[in-house]
Amino acid sequence: MSLAPHGGVLVNRVNEAYDFQHIAHEIELDVMAFSDLELIGIGAYSPLQGFMTEKDYLSVFENMRLSSGEVWTLPITLPVDEQKALSLKAGDTVRLTYNGETYGVIEIEDIYTPDKKTEAVNIYKTDELEHPGVKKLFDRGSVYVGGPITLIKRSVKQFPAHTFEPLETRKKFAELGWKTIVGFQTRNPVHRAHEYIQKTALETVDGLFLNPLVGETKSDDIPADVRMESYQVLLDGYYPKDRVFLGVFPAAMRYAGPKEAIFHALVRKNYGCTHFIVGRDHAGVGDYYGTYEAQELFDQFAPEEIGITPLKFEHSFYCNVCGSMATAKTCPHGKEHHVILSGTKVRAMLRSGEFPPSTFSRPEVIQTLIKGLAAGVS
């Protein structure tokens, strides 16, 4: 049986019959706000009812909680530029557009100017513009607009066969008879290390929800459609079909490390997962976060506050002496016997058509990735 959503109720802010024709004011959304609008509307970000007011925004900073008390670690905000902010006021109802088309409305409760340097250091642990999350933060508008939203129109889906809302995943898990479901978040192809921890987790639960992020990522990440092909190849060849469910997570990647790990877990709870895999440097980038810092942040909260059970895994690798996948917990041999490649190194190999060793990744997966990247699919 799926867990109760975060906050106890699955939010539904969808009203496709909403009459917005009389509303003159509009805010044009960027890619991140566009995906956030829909994810709020369909309940993936429950208990959020809209973009954060200053009260919730500050509470997330100070307490890693919403002002109502629920654990929440990332600000979900609607930035506008100063010129646009001058034309808005609390009490206004404003259309939310993307590429000129109306997808929702916001009832403005609050308009406020954040201290972005403080936000960067609090959320990303740095204010360096080399960090992709920090750069994105400073590239966005300097004023935030808060208030409840109504989702009037859903976006056109890049992967319609693999796009499911929380109500749908919960129904699917029930139909499959799964009482315990482990969620796995990734923005990367699934190599043997991921396969190992997924299958280790699968030994202890009824089903695996493979939930790759397909929203906005940094420019050198593998494109989502190439990754999706590689996931399908792997699942078709190496996973039991009745124990795995593939569905995409259409959010933007924040690269906020530990705080994003908590956020990712809470969202998967809303999708119906009971467990969530937290590996090494979850949602990390570069060397900004400690290897197991994300796992440690879960320990700052009582289990019932998070509600979903984190499954913490050590860094896994192939050991040439053991002749199998292992971690430091199970392998006594030195690093010289371990097959470990960085994500940066693997991406460079793939783009040059070079095959990483089969002990690192399934050959069929590598073939799919190289072919997709060579075709320039994005």
Swiss-Prot record:
Keywords: ATP-binding, Nucleotide-binding, Nucleotidyltransferase, Transferase. It comes from Bacillus licheniformis (strain ATCC 14580 / DSM 13 / JCM 2505 / CCUG 7422 / NBRC 12200 / NCIMB 9375 / NCTC 10341 / NRRL NRS-1264 / Gibson 46). Belongs to the sulfate adenylyltransferase family. It holds the Pfam family PUA_2. It is an enzyme of class 2 (transferase). Pathway: Sulfur metabolism; hydrogen sulfide biosynthesis; sulfite from sulfate: step 1/3. It comes from the Bacteria. This is Sulfate adenylyltransferase. The gene is sat. It catalyses: sulfate + ATP + H(+) = adenosine 5'-phosphosulfate + diphosphate. Disulfide bonds: none annotated. GO terms for biological process: hydrogen sulfide biosynthetic process; sulfate assimilation. Coiled coil: none annotated.
